[in-house]
Amino acid sequence: MKFSKFFSNVQETPWYLDFLNPVINEITAYKKLLDFGTGTGKLIQILSTEKGTECIGVDTNSEMLLEAQKKLKGTKTKLFKIKPDANLPFKNNDFDYVTICSVLFHLKKNSVDYALIEAQRLLKDEGKIIILTPTGNGNFLTLSKNFFSFKNLSIYMWFYATRNRAKIWTNNNYLKHYANENKLNYKSQKVMNGFAQLEIITV
């Protein structure tokens, strides 16, 4: 099985919905949203069908986008393949939200800055960049206490695969420093019983 198909299946599990819910709850219905690093498209599938959000998803991975096309069949959501660190093909000040889930903590600093600068360009006044990232906090026991079920077995793979990079990202507070340096409003909260962090920058 290709990783893109495996990841698409993971996105259908109960724990993954728990992971995405904090982002979903931040989105006002019938707004326009860009999902940066959309992967196989679960977030924008939910938002387009449940909140009437006008969604565009972008990703660098063709196989992920092929899986997203299957998931998004029958919706008006649009998908674009992009090159790393290239300007996005959208006009300035056109989106209410830019969402970035489980992406930035994998990237080098220059790529993180690129994503944030592009997000600022694309957002309307008072638009929001919403970033969701695993924290790397917790352990096998706390994970089992909160999420154990046979449908959630993939959460253990997710936790151990992301833990080291996630801890570094969480401890560095990069987005908080970025927002302060650029005089942007920033807030954050731990979500998903402390296993993830939601960070919001308002431009």
Predicted features and spans:
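Conserved class I S-adenosyl-L-methionine
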Residues: 1-28, 30-39, 42
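Short conserved loop adjoining the S-adenosyl-L-methionine
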Residues: 87-92
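Conserved beta-strand signature within the Rossmann-like core of class I S-adenosyl-L-methionine
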Residues: 127-134
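Class I SAM-dependent methyltransferase SAM/SAH-binding core
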Residues: 40-86
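C-terminal alpha-helical "lid/dimerization" subdomain adjacent to the S-adenosyl-L-methionine
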Residues: 134-178
